[in-house]
Amino acid sequence: MKYNEQEVDRRRTFAIVSHPDAGKTTITEKLLLFGGAIQQAGEVRARKAARHATSDWMEMEKQRGISVTSSVMKFTYRDYEVNLLDTPGHNDFSEDTYRVLTAVDSALMVIDSVKGVESQTIKLLDVCRLRHTPIMTFINKLDREGRDPFELIDEIEKVLRIQCAPMTWPIGMGKRFRGTYHLYTKELVIFDAEAERGTGGVISMTGLDDPQLDELLGSQADELRADVELLEGAAHPFEEEAYHAGLQTPVFFGSAINTFGVQQLLDTFVDHAPAPLPREAVSRTVSPYEEPFTAFAFKIQANMDPAHRDRIAFFRICSGKFTRGMKVRHVRLGREVAINNATIFMAQDRTHVDEAFPGDIIGIHNHGTIKIGDTFTLGEDIKFTGIPNFAPEHFRRVRLLDPLKSKALEKGLTQLAEEGTTQVFRPLMGADWVVGAVGLLQFDVVMHRLEHEYNVKATYEPVSYVTARWVTGEKKKVEEFQKKEVMNCYIDGEGDLAYLAGSQWRLDNTMDNWKDLTFHATREHS
């Protein structure tokens, strides 16, 4: 018998991915609106009134209007429990986004109809493809003059190398935007920017020959008929199996800022998106229908509540049932812990959770003992795979302005590195820390947070490193390597040896000279 079958099958856990400014935060809020999780969308337009978007809660995000950290939100829709993970909307945060995508079962891609496929979308889709993540697509901003919908579909197929299966089709755009026609339910949804939730009515049609179509749309009715005829000949029909395999993306059109088209997307999402999927571990595959509890940490966030100076570890439940107060085994440390204060999130608002099931994301207070990739079980030594650290591409040396703050600097850098958006390196020789990041914006984030959350003022100095490699091998050889290459050897935040190279040539040369050692470009979270 499948354990918790009903609870598992009604869960949907997904992330929203897009290029900055495609409307990701807006669609997040509209989904929460339909789920009854918020009463009023804090749209970006209302930011001047200091009602910042619900999911962008960190100070720096509020200033810049981009999601810098990924937050977790939960809502109920049509008896489905939906866990929505917002991902960073800035291209410097690919590493954090990658880890968020390890915790979800599917993704929603938001594309700006004016701009089409953008660079960040391509990167994010590559990450989804690595994991065969099923993707649904929402083409946004139909209330503006955008690109031809056929052209957009063609671009998605060619650039992102994924089949498109249009589910709804737009009638006009910009000033001529009248609504969408659902190709499968035959419903016509009329757009009305003044109406509540952007919808002037949902009209069931017998098909495209229905005379109501001409009455409502006038000359645009024939345009719609011609478009649909073309689609029937050229577009891919929706196939759930191809969607689940990550080979096909169902496509919806709408205007998130007007809440238009969002409900059609949400209905299809809960009906067709996968329920919690099995998870790969080192020793075996873990089914969501197993009775023993398992979960892994995919994200750590410091100072979510400045009043409490707290750190929260986000866990994805993979199997079994979580109940408040239960004792679990922290596999890496080999010790038993009781979880009394797990929380679920609605962006910054959090509530204590009494029970949770596979697919759910829970937050657990972390006093420095939980690291990304850690597993909690009821006793079995399981380690889930595929949660990596990437080698940084940018480096800065940190110079402290007040020498008396060195302990606070160490604490700040270590805690921020635990979140996984930056990495810290302590030299084997010398005292100055080096911060490594996959993207440049992360350096600003570290400085800002050191000052505002740890009361540490520091500056950066350029440092001539271009990449890092983690070094492993026989103990004697590693010790010999450390002596010979001491100027380039560092210890990372996890206590592992890293070699920082000043050029690709230098790295290649060092690897040639030390063939007995292994140089790793990524490191699994241990």
Curated annotation (Swiss-Prot):
The keyword RNA-binding does not apply. It comes from the Bacteria. Residues 9-277 form the tr-type G domain. InterPro entries: EF-G-like_DII (IPR053905), EFG_III/V (IPR035647), G_TR_CS (IPR031157), P-loop_NTPase (IPR027417), PrfC (IPR004548), RF3_C (IPR032090), RF3_dom_3_sf (IPR038467), RF3_GTP-bd (IPR041732). GTP binds at residues 18-25, 86-90, 140-143. PROSITE patterns: G_TR_1, G_TR_2. Gene3D superfamilies: P-loop containing nucleotide triphosphate hydrolases, Peptide chain release factor 3, domain III. One of its GO terms (molecular function) is GTP binding. GO terms for cellular component: cytosol. It is found in: Cytoplasm. One of its GO terms (biological process) is translational termination. The keyword Nucleotide-binding applies. HAMAP family: Rel_fac_3. Increases the formation of ribosomal termination complexes and stimulates activities of RF-1 and RF-2. It binds guanine nucleotides and has strong preference for UGA stop codons. It may interact directly with the ribosome. The stimulation of RF-1 and RF-2 is significantly reduced by GTP and GDP, but not by GMP. This is Peptide chain release factor 3. The gene is prfC.
